[in-house]
Amino acid sequence: MSAVFDASAFLATCSNRPGVYRMFDADAKLLYVGKAKSLKKRLASYFRKSGLAPKTAALVARIAQVETTITANETEALLLEQTLIKEWRPPYNILLRDDKSYPFVFLSSEDEYPRLSLHRGAKKRKGRYFGPYPSAGAIRESLNLLQKAFLVRQCEDSYFRNRTRPCLQYQIKRCKGPCVGLVSPEEYAEDVRHSVMFLEGRSNALADELNVGMEQAAMRLDFEKAAELRDQVAILRRVQDQQSMEGGNGDVDIVAAIVTPGGACVHLISVRGGRVLGSKNFFPQVAIEEEVGEVLLAFLGQYYLSHQERDLPAELIVNVTHEDFPVLVSAIAEARGRELEISYRVRGTRARWQQLAVTNAEQALGARLANRQHVAARFEALAEALDLAEPPQRLECFDISHSSGEATVASCVVFGPEGPLKSDYRRYNIEGVTAGDDYAAMHQALTRRFSRLKDGEGKMPDILLVDGGKGQLAMAQEVLQELAVAGLILLGVAKGVTRKPGLETLYLNDASHEFTLPADSPALHLIQQIRDEAHRFAITGHRARRGKARRTSTLEDVPGVGPKRRRDLLKHFGGLQELSRASIDELAKAPGISKKLAEQIYAVLHSE
């Protein structure tokens, strides 16, 4: 029992009514938020003299203050609890990683030839959003299928607008070539309509419609069209066999939770319109001993109550039950305006799906724990290689990515003994440096990172790993000296002459200590892993930034030149490069271009 908290005096005045309680430490830091049918009974269970699990006892030992809020009923208590957990993320609560955006399939509506794409973030563009999906992988699978079946374009708008001949997707029959007018807007619109039917889960109606169209095409002796529709039906049937859930066309989420001494995993399978959209593993943070039912209840509350944009199914199939599920159903109905059913005892196909979710959760948790042990062993090997008294707890690695100085991005990735700490990853858009100057880019990124540390933001790494050898290591040391940052180890890594993995040269601190590690060294494998992850994270950020900069064609800056006229101009001159070389008189000879408009186009193309 806490020495600084008088539990007896507190419990003597505690209410027996439903409500929410908040536990604080001596520094007024919120440790834990909970709800209870009876506040007094629930809180008394924490302060009994024996029988507490070790992690729960550790929580109780830190309690210096408890605050309670009485609610009208358990439903209000659950809603308030979820609000507080989302806002404060107390360290002893069961917490999900806070996904800030969810993936959707986006169909543009402003284009003559609409595009299908994966979308995250704010819904600013006009069009239809299908989802959210459980993972980006599930969306890519659907997009790949739609591209095979209906050939709706998925290329970037800038790429689409500047084509003068069909791309490879047309050659391999994944696109009908709308960029160069090889398909009419009417035929393309029909393909888009069929794609929408599929995304809406109306696969059976779509298959019926395609079958009718196939028969009609055959009667007209249009065997090419009939064969195309036949292939589309075959793809649909194959998908239905692979992704359908027998027993109806309902919207169901199958959720299974597994808890072991090493951690917890929740596996979710999402079914909409009888079609499996995909699945995802979640690894909630569990700081105190919890039964599997408590973990599942906490997951469902955070997953469906904390994010209103998530699609709500009609039914949940779960692998364990909990006495508070009726309260959860009531809370979801109040917050979302819709009721759902939670099923535990299911039979037949539904039971097989339930078991599949359990199996996936078990396998995912087992793989995660094995990887955690693997990474921890590598951290111990690194400590031995660097002659450290104990393994480091936080490694940060920086890398730079650009294309000939364009759209320079620096990345910072973070690893701990349990693996990548992706919520701590950061990217830095580099500005104001000479194009291609990696040293200046590294100086700017490190200055921004460690200036924030000096201001009390973020955590100090034990080891700072810099990809680039002596030069970048010297730059990192210069930044740390400028900011008076001390107490960390600097480690530079340079590729060998052949640039093959296993031949890296390592430099410690001021580069006075140069050494190598055996190719089979676990310590070297850890260094390679974090370096490669930093490179991956930098290059994906660079490509996104470069793509955004290139997405707008120069011609889009010309008033009066819309998508059709841009396409006609590019087709007339054979591409943007040839168009840029044209004189005003040559531009004015293009169909639909007046002398005044030609002058405007020329001015924009030669503004630099």
Curated annotation (Swiss-Prot):
Record InterPro entries: GIY-YIG_endonuc, GIY-YIG_endonuc_sf, GIY-YIG_UvrC_Cho, Hlx-hairpin-Hlx_DNA-bd_motif, RuvA_2-like, UVR_dom, UVR_dom_sf, UvrABC_protein_C
Chief location: cytoplasm
Keywords: Cytoplasm, DNA damage, DNA excision, DNA repair, Excision nuclease, SOS response
Gene3D superfamilies per UniProt: 5' to 3' exonuclease, C-terminal subdomain, GIY-YIG endonuclease, UVR domain, UvrC, RNAse H endonuclease domain
One protein family per Pfam: UvrC_RNaseH
GIY-YIG domain boundaries: 16-94
CDD domains from the UniProt entry: GIY-YIG_UvrC_Cho
Residue span, UVR domain: 204-239
Gene Ontology molecular function terms on file: DNA binding; excinuclease ABC activity
Annotated compartments: Cytoplasm
Record bears the keyword DNA damage: yes
Coiled coil feature spans: none
The keyword Membrane belongs to this UniProt entry's keyword annotation: no
GO cellular component: cytoplasm; excinuclease repair complex
BP GO terms, sorted: nucleotide-excision repair; SOS response
Summary of subunit composition and partner proteins: Interacts with UvrB in an incision complex.
NCBIfam families assigned to the protein according to its UniProt record, in alphabetical order: PRK00558.1-5, uvrC
Function: The UvrABC repair system catalyzes the recognition and processing of DNA lesions. UvrC both incises the 5' and 3' sides of the lesion. The N-terminal half is responsible for the 3' incision and the C-terminal half is responsible for the 5' incision.
Family affiliation: Belongs to the UvrC family.
Protein name listed in UniProt: UvrABC system protein C
Taxonomic placement: Bacteria, Pseudomonadati, Pseudomonadota, Gammaproteobacteria, Pseudomonadales
